[in-house]
Amino acid sequence: YAYLCANFTDLEGKAVLDGYQVLTYGDVKVGYVGIDTPESFTKSTPTYFQDAAGNYIYSFSQGNEGKDLYDVVQKAVDAAKAEGADYVVALGHLGVDEQSSPWTSTEVIANTTGIDVLIDGHSHSTFAKTEKNQAGEDVLVAQTGTKLANLGKVVIDTKTGEITSELVAAKDCAAEDEATGA
């Protein structure tokens, strides 16, 4: 699978990574859209995004009180749909914490259309819930917590259109290896 991030660009707006990818499973096409929090500048290692003089040389579409992020995500979703995606799964590192506003997964969903599922991270939360998109449609949002405590499973029933999510505790997924004790 490719690394995807619709909102990671250089300062001229040129994408650093592909924003989306469409994969085919039988006769169903699924578009995957990558989204990273603009908080990456401050919550990771800032020097990764700076030149030798300390000037930022990248953007995460952080401007206009969230609108820049919503717009670039919408463009990637629309492009995936134009390529024939039957479903769009957003892969986000946005989170739901209030201090991450206006870039939370909830806000991205509320300001876009066309996303069916958003698999999220960043806030290390554990949940599966629905949020309304800009058109008032339900979008499943799920997070699996932190440090591989859980594995997430999302199922799209292509006959009914129902989308479900399940959390599975990692400890329940594999027996301990006798040789390593892990």
Language model features with spans:
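Acidic, metal/ion-coordinating pockets
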Residues: 1-176, 180
